[in-house]
Amino acid sequence: VIEEDGYTTILSSKDLCMIDHLKELVDAGVDSLKIEGRMKSSYYVAVVTRAYRKALDALKTGDERWKMFRQDLFDISHREYSTGFFFGHGPVDPTMGQGIDKSTEQGYLRDYLFCGFIGEQVEPGVFALELKNQIRTGMTIEYIASDVYRIEDDAFCLLDENFQSIDQADHGKMQYLKTDKAIEKGYIIRRETVVK
């Protein structure tokens, strides 16, 4: 916390994460949440929004499946998490790292790489690709969507603009993905950062 010339600035080397404390926030009268998305990718905003939406819905329904979406918060690119000053200076949850008053141990953490989006279906099981990062045949990719947790696919085929088989697809080219998985336009494609 920096105080100078009549203003106060709060700077943190950590990302605020309050998903485990939504009940306390709602009980305190909070009826709107702001996801910090400035300078973040559409993938980041989609995953974070989905996790918080599922957690808020679970407050009403008691559905415990929201916890699997919570895990995605640890898979996206993020700094060490903290609950900020909501509960004082110390850590409330050991999965959130040190308290806000301790310097962060690591830079950005990321278990998954955002690869792009599924585009228009051009024929049954064949979709245009809107890629941001490379994918290759033989690797395992995942599809996620607002109500779809994860669909793994390691048997997809990649096609060039002439529908000829290729080994890899890259950003900025007209390419297609052929799969037997039940996916749709708009699904997000991602892969683990350490390719197995």
Regions found by a protein language model. Give the residues of each.
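Surface-exposed amphipathic alpha-helical tracts and adjacent flexible/coil segments at the periphery
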Residues: 1-196
